[in-house]
């Protein structure tokens, strides 16, 4: 078995170079699970959490943003829409939110954000196939209360959040870096070849 691989990011992760009072979601907004998850997050989580997190802004980015989400913009919710550069946008923001309630397959955007050292709050569905550990590499929330508590944790204890992001980066580099996966593939092929032809 060879996992999905991502390119190594040669990016200096400097403390304090991003908007510390921000959280964000980025993804294709013509994909039904993204629409459902973000709508749920806005209606059930953010509608309560933003009162407890004054000064924190939620940024929603992604192509084909539906009118139902465009209408949600307010002083603590910035509906950005499509952005040119996922990496640059992510590096400018703090906590990544991935509130997936449905869908299958590995979440490439989560792996890419982890490789940037981002702290991510997602659901059990969002982390499927990745193998990251809750509270160490990522924060997993499957209820409204858990999402709110993890948001409050990240903004009240930025050093803890930063540590989770750094652990996420190390985890992805160890398990999903393309050059390491290719090296493992070569090793496996050599082992097969060394056994000779199948009689």
Regions found by a protein language model. Give the residues of each.
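Conserved catalytic-core segment of nucleotide-activated headgroup transferases in glycan assembly
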Residues: 1, 6-92
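Short hydrophobic beta-strand element within catalytic cores of glycosyltransferases
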Residues: 109-112, 119-123
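Short glycine/proline-enriched, acidic/aromatic patches that form the donor-sugar handling elements
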Residues: 67-69, 86-87, 104-107, 126-131
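Acidic donor-binding loop of glycosyltransferase active sites
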Residues: 91-105, 116-119
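Short acidic/histidine- and often glycine-rich active-site loop of Leloir-type glycosyltransferases
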Residues: 124-140
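A short, well-ordered alpha-helix in the C-terminal region of glycosyltransferases
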Residues: 153, 160-174, 181-187
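Conserved acidic donor-binding segment of nucleotide-sugar-dependent glycosyltransferases
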Residues: 138-145, 153-158
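C-terminal alpha-helical cap of glycosyltransferases
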Residues: 178-199
